[in-house]
Amino acid sequence: MKMVKTINEQLSEFIVGLRYEDIPKDVIAHLKDVMLDNFGCGLFGSTTPWMAIYRKVLMERTDRKEASIWGTDLKTSVTGAMMINGASINSFELDDTHTDGIIHVGTGVLGCVTAFAEMLESVSGREFLTAATLAYEVSCRVAAPVGMEIAHQGFNNTGSCCPFGSTAAVSKFLGLDAEQTKHAMGIAGNWAGGLQAVQFTSMAKRIVPSRSSEGAIVGALLAKEGFTGIEDVFENEFGGFYHCFSNHIYDKERVCGDLGNRWELMGIGLKYYSTCRSKHTTIGGLRRFMKENPDITPEDIEKITVHTTSITQKYALQNQEIKSVTAAQLSHPYVCAVTILEGNAFIEQFTEEKLRDPKILDFMKKVEVVADEEIENLPRPLRYTVKIDILTKDGRTFHIREEYPKGHPKNPFTRKELLWKFKQLAGKAISDESRLDRIIEAEQNLEDVERITDFTKLLTKQGA
């Protein structure tokens, strides 16, 4: 009788067998765009006050100088650089999102992939791209069938799923065989987790997605030495991954079906606004409304009602005092207010000064977010859909429907928008525009880079 292979076995065989030549050109192109966006987010994140605290504390724990910290002239241990750079990507609500998995893949894996490759020194651009493809793809596959289930269970999606993607990359770098990779995954699964509640007010929200990928480095290094892990880490009915994180609800075919032919990472979208992704269709709809109705001023608006999913309504932070930038980025009323009053919801709209702006605080009172049964029952790819009702003081009501946020695979960035966002963010850490152009050129041609360290130097304060 032929034994059915576990998810772990199938993923491990895929990880070991994948070659750069096997990856379709459009997948590589999309991955490069996602990573460029991640690098921009990370460079900007390095300038934030919470990352300064995190960097200081982690660097005090070690004297090792194995990998660079982006946007600085500092080096630290590979695990320290992984956690710091990964957290920097997530530090201002600007990073990528996989729609179905509800994970921010870059913050979960790119810090790890880059730091480990830099530590090894001899990794080529093609080897880096192969490992990065595995990191993003495996993370998305693990998350794709259970995004809503993990969130409803109260866990952080990215911190729960991305340790497996990071493990795929580190195992690839180390040349582990399928058996060793299987055990590396089974070890790293013990680092999966993070609480959903962390995202609403605390600075800790920034660090949870990346810290769990420490398990990837530990797991792969241990497995290389013969250490064993949970072989059926995904399916085990007594505390396996899907038992714990999604109440054993998952689609095995979505996780490991058609490996190497169907690419889940193509479902990764980018953010155009500096807020929780679930607010982006609202922002897009309101911006479109103001553009189409230039005669209507913020003062003319009596009320805005946003119809959305129950989970988005639950976490809209309505009727709450906004005490932190983190909370503002999660607050639907705040996001609506700055969009109407200032025309955008980018980095300039989320400052300590803005949190105390009386115009913004007053306008927030006009916003109500309600759960909508129709939207609740839409297919998962349409879960960002919103219906917006805008009532003006003269009695008119406007109805807006927005389905795909800017940056979603169905509503992608133009090349100009991608580069604009990168330069806006990275430029806060690296003021030399010619170096920003060099980063873009090198990143978009990573397959030609002989040693990945030639690229990572560009991400530091001093550059190459």
Predicted regions and their residues:
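Short amphipathic alpha-helical face segments that pack within enzyme cores
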Residues: 107-115, 161, 165-169, 280-285, ...
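Hydrophobic face of alpha-helices
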Residues: 28, 32, 36, 109, ...
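Terminal-appendage/accessory-domain detector
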Residues: 1-103, 200, 204-214, 221-464
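Short helix-coil transition sites and intra-membrane helix breaks within transmembrane domains
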Residues: 101-106, 155-160, 275
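Short connector loops/turns at beta-strand edges and beta->alpha or beta->beta junctions
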Residues: 89, 108-110, 115-117, 138, ...
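Glycine-rich, mobile lid/loop segments that gate access to catalytic sites or pores
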Residues: 117-218, 225, 230-241
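Function-dense linear segments that define catalytic or interfacial modules
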Residues: 80-126, 134-138, 142
